[in-house]
C-alpha cells in the first residue's frame, strides 16, 4: 500500500467537511481531551488495538488532531492526523454500519484542512488502502517506492 501526497493548497472547500454531513444528523468535530477513552474503545472495537494506540498521541496535541463523527451521542467514525508522523493523515475509519453516507470523506477533508491550518503545504496519507477514493476526493497522488516507508520493521 503506497503513501499518497496531497497538495493542501488545492483542498476541496471546507464546506465539504463537517457541514456536508450535518443535515444527515451527524456532528463532526475535534475530540475533547476527556473523550480519549471512548474514542479508543470505538477504534479497538471496530478496527484494531494498534490503531487505538497510534491515535492516542493525538490527544496530547493542542489542538487535538483527531476528528470524530457522532450520531445520536455515539461515535460512528474518526480521523487522526499528526499521529503516525508529522503531516500524516490517518488512521481513519467509519463504523461499517454507517459507510456510504459521506462521513469518511468529510472526516478526510476536515483533517486535511487541520494540517493546512498547522502550516503544511502537503499532507501524506500513509499506507493508503483506497487510493482511488483519495485521488477523487482530494487529488492525492501516489508517492513512488513509498512502501513500506515508515511502516518497515514494525514491532508486533
Regions found by a protein language model. Give the residues of each.
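A short beta-loop-alpha structural element at the N-terminal edge
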Residues: 27-38
Amino acid at each position: 500500500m503506497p503513501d499518497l501526497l496531497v497538495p493542501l493548497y488545492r483542498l476541496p472547500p471546507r464546506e465539504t467537511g463537517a457541514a456536508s454531513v450535518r443535515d444527515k444528523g451527524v456532528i463532526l468535530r475535534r475530540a475533547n481531551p476527556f473523550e480519549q477513552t471512548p474514542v479508543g474503545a470505538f477504534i479497538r472495537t471496530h478496527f484494531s488495538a494498534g490503531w487505538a494506540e497510534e491515535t492516542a498521541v493525538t490527544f496530547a496535541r493542542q489542538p487535538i488532531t483527531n476528528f470524530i463523527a457522532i450520531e445520536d451521542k455515539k461515535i460512528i467514525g474518526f480521523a487522526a492526523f499528526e499521529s503516525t508522523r508529522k503531516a500524516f493523515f490517518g488512521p481513519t475509519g467509519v463504523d461499517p454500519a454507517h459507510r456510504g453516507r459521506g462521513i469518511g470523506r468529510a472526516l478526510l477533508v476536515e483533517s486535511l484542512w487541520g494540517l493546512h491550518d498547522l502550516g503544511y503545504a502537503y499532507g501524506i496519507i500513509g499506507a493508503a488502502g483506497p487510493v482511488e477514493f483519495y485521488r477523487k476526493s482530494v487529488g492525492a497522488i501516489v508517492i513512488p517506492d513509498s512502501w513500506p516507508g515508515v511502516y518497515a520493521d514494525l514491532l508486533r
